[in-house]
Amino acid sequence: PHQGRGGAGRFFNFRRMKRILRHILPVILCLPALGGCMKWDYADMEEFAATGPGLFITNEGNFQYGNATLSYYDPATKKVENEVFYRANAMKLGDVAQSMTIHNDLGWIVVNNSHVVFAIDLRTFKEVGRITNLTSPRYIHFVSDEKAYVTQLWDNRIFIVNPRRYEITGYIECPGMTPGSGSTEQMVQYGQYVYVNCWSYQNRLLKIDTRTDRVVDELVVGVQPTSLVLDA
């Protein structure tokens, strides 16, 4: 049937609109998740020289936004320095700073969703090493200068690492867990045994013999135990 000029004009405009949408639609879809689409800027390195005791604060950030940071508070000057890892190393800390432990004059920062543990100098805040290829690390516990345990989310293993060489040396299998449902969290040590709470969708404490790196006992507790401390 004959459409005339009006029909042809409408057909032409529809085709043109399709071309426009093809170009702007990816931009529109990207806007709600701008954090996932943006590129993280890198800064120039700054020099720090912390003196005396201080307080480190890990700022978790937003999951999947890669905006975790590290702050430092100096009690003597009552001054807070924010983003010290970023400023000292000219790179972002990563996605979800879960915890930090101090051992042998180094700060060990566990970055959960970046699958890494960073070791930093406590005075300059500069990175001196890192442990990579972790599943979803939560906490690190030092058994000795050459052995540490790293708990994981979504894994049925606790990783054994060598802090001197920054490498994975083995695994502790957690009974009754699957890779998709496994979860181990905080750790405390009493004598030769390390006790670890099993958090997400779990209800147990595990007892690990540090001489054999094996689970030797377990205790059923309430649902999702989040933390534990040692009564000295």
Q: Positions of the model-derived regions?
A:
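Predominantly soluble domains enriched in secretory-pathway, periplasmic, or organellar proteins
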Residues: C37-A232
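Sec-dependent bacterial lipoprotein signal peptides
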Residues: P1-G35
